């Protein structure tokens, strides 16, 4: 491994020299380590651990923009990759966790992630990096839900809050550590090490699971032959659900920004999305025994309430995480790195909230009241974030983030605990996968809604500001750190920054709505204690 890494590094250095000699723009990933694209830095602080590593590396690897796919093609690529990660992985993998040993399924997913890391480490062009990241996404998509499932398999319910709190706190802390490690590796060695480092870590995880986790017998013996085994995994349901959600996401992303709401493209996307969704629901009802989302599971009151709660909190989290960084860069005029540092309050408070939520669950025993506290903090935090302006003091925006982070941390594990109090053990893997699917789905939908709100408000207010010579489309295409370069006097700059501030804070109303809805969903969850729960038959 050391020799391979050294060879990769030498190859990188050789290519850098060729670039200097020929004075050409970089055309492949290997040629890009000495360059920096500020647009790609805008969201690096929003990613956790591994995402932080690779995104930090991506800042050092720009290409000639003429070589990128067009807007439509790029939208389809990114939606396919991101949606494929959590749709193809989360829900169908819940079936794997149900019918096969969670230990071996989890180890296989980690191995797939390692393969993707190896592909990314050896990439000679950006297309190969995309392939590597997609493979990583498939493996990583089932790891989070799988971690919770493994805890459910190996710990009694009354002890799980402590372990889940540690798990969620670790995720929050990794959001800080990941980009820092990625930046250090990219600056002092090579971006390839952001991929290479995952390989020994993944190997260590597999070794620990192999030697220390007891494998539970799966239910694969119920299925006779490959046809029956494949049928158990519900390929029809997955084939209907994936394009349905992609259509919905694209419609929400494009409507009101690229196209009007009555444009035929938007209408067609909603129609196709609706028809595919109906087809998915029908397929689940006709084959309940092999359904990806069994009706008897999702229609259970606590499961449905927990799914909705997870979707709302996930949506609020991604909206705030996405836009608070933009606010720091555009309104407070700081770099992407400084914006990342200023969101530490949000991330650390999530970690503290996760630990406190775990302790509270073990002490109180009932998830619903903690979910209500979580929703209250989220709603209050998001509401306060809507008051941000150009002159907001640091004590205020730090305090607002802490309230938001505590709310997110408090509620992050409660849905997974609640469903275990009402379901049979065989249905728990499916329910937990459904919970994490809801979190990812809610995040994707609400980010699109937030983007739409931002665009609508920004276009309207910028038109009212009447800044001479300023093109609205150009501003929307410009990174948050660069918008100040588009105007040339203080009066116009003040108008532009004020417009941007109002547009960003308008997106926090979306998070506020999600927080209020999560409060309502918590009332659906039954008050059943996690202490000494009798198995459900």
Curated annotation (Swiss-Prot):
Pfam families in alphabetical order: MFS_1
Keyword Electron transport listed: no
Compositional bias (Basic and acidic residues): 1-25
Positions annotated with a glycan in the UniProt record: 47, 333, 501
Subcellular location: Cell membrane
GO cellular component, one term: plasma membrane
Keyword terms of this UniProt record: Cell membrane, Glycoprotein, Membrane, Transmembrane, Transmembrane helix, Transport
Recorded GO MF terms: transmembrane transporter activity
Main location: membrane
Membrane topology type: Multi-pass membrane protein
Keyword Transport: yes
InterPro entries per UniProt: MFS (IPR011701), MFS_dom (IPR020846), MFS_trans_sf (IPR036259)
Transmembrane segments: 71-91, 104-124, 137-157, 162-182, 193-213, 236-256, 266-286, 304-324, 339-359, 363-383, 397-417, 430-450, 507-527
Record family assignment: Belongs to the major facilitator superfamily. TCR/Tet family.
Free-text function comment from the UniProt entry: Efflux pump; part of the gene cluster that mediates the biosynthesis of ustilaginoidins, dimeric gamma-naphthopyrones isolated from different fungal species.
Protein name: Efflux pump ustT
